[in-house]
Amino acid sequence: MVYYDLNIDSSLPEPKIKSMLSLHTKYGYDSVAITHTVEGKIGYKDVCKIKKIQIEDDSEKSTSSGWMKMGDSNKTIKQYTRLQVICKTMAEFQMITANNPVVQSYDIISVVPYDVSVFNAACNSNEIDIITIDTFSKFIIKPERVRQCIAKGIFIEILYGNLFGIDADRIAFFQIASSLVRSSFGKNIILSSSGKSSTTLRSPYDLSNLGHLFGLTFDQAKAAVSKHPHTAVLHAITRRTKGIATVTDPNLLKDLELWKLERKEDTQPTNNNIPHEKHINKESTGKETIPKPTTTTTTTTTTTTTAKTKTPTPTPTTEKTPSIPTQPPQKPTAKSNKKTTTNTTSTAQKQGKMDIDIDNNKRKRE
């Protein structure tokens, strides 16, 4: 288990900071944040100037259990830099942007709101990691804003160092802590010392018992000094590092790579410059021609012919001279079905008249 204390005042003398780091190591803390506090608008004079403190005493070794006893672990305490801005107006809060070089020079960014409008804006901000609730924050904390803060991944810090001050600060601490626990159900709560005196520092197990006094369970109070601060540090790293990361199933990745290879084979040219036979004109070799589309038109014509027949006229003769019978007219050849159906009745009548005339001529000759 890794324990954190994310609030140690950087304005203290260096020997005192070094003694406090040694005490943190004895209590089992693994990481701390040295905080630079700015009241009002931040400027170029507030660029990070915090240097890493070297602990020379080798006898001060950290404990893995969090109790105040000497251990055999040789791990050194990790130090982060933190900027804490006390904002009373929205103009001061709007100075905290990702493009500000002062903000970029620190590892962790936190805000101490003294106005409800600043607190509401901080709960919906992407530029900060921690909201510190101080006893000077004289406003009502709404549960909706706290849940919005949790959804954004922002953590709310409570400074337990106010318990060792005057009675008014102690009462204000329990009121604020109880309302935050009721609103957040114990989520995204961080417990930190004020970092101004070694007498106010407590071990992680003492803070776990302290959490019971304002509504936290043992696991939630333990997470307030281990899991939640660790997540806040990761949130700060992701805020500073802008990029895109994808997580895929290995089996799905194999299928995707195979699909890319197949797609590459389909789209890669084959360096074949010889055209296909259907695109080559046989008469003119070497020239590629596009076959022209052929259209066929069918026309149907119907012709109608009228059969002209000469009716025989009798010639008056005094002598009996044989008359040459007229040949019957040839039947017209109908080229269409309509002609054959319309002329069948007329030809039959004309043929009957011609037969009667021939019989009359034979009788006259006799």
From Swiss-Prot:
GO MF terms held by the record: ribonuclease P activity; ribonuclease P RNA binding; RNA binding; tRNA binding
Keyword Ligase belongs to the record: no
**EC number per UniProt:** 3.1.26.5
- InterPro entries linked to this entry: Pol/histidinol_Pase-like, RNase_P_p30
Q: What Gene3D superfamilies would the database entry show?
A: Metal-dependent hydrolases
What class does this enzyme belong to in the EC scheme? Answer: hydrolase
Query: What is the similarity comment for this entry?
Result: Belongs to the eukaryotic/archaeal RNase P protein component 3 family.
Briefly state the protein's biological role: Component of ribonuclease P, a protein complex that generates mature tRNA molecules by cleaving their 5'-ends.
Report what the protein is called.
Ribonuclease P protein subunit drpp30
- What organism is listed for this UniProt entry? Dictyostelium discoideum (Social amoeba)
Could you read off the lineage of the organism from its UniProt record? Eukaryota, Amoebozoa, Evosea, Eumycetozoa, Dictyostelia
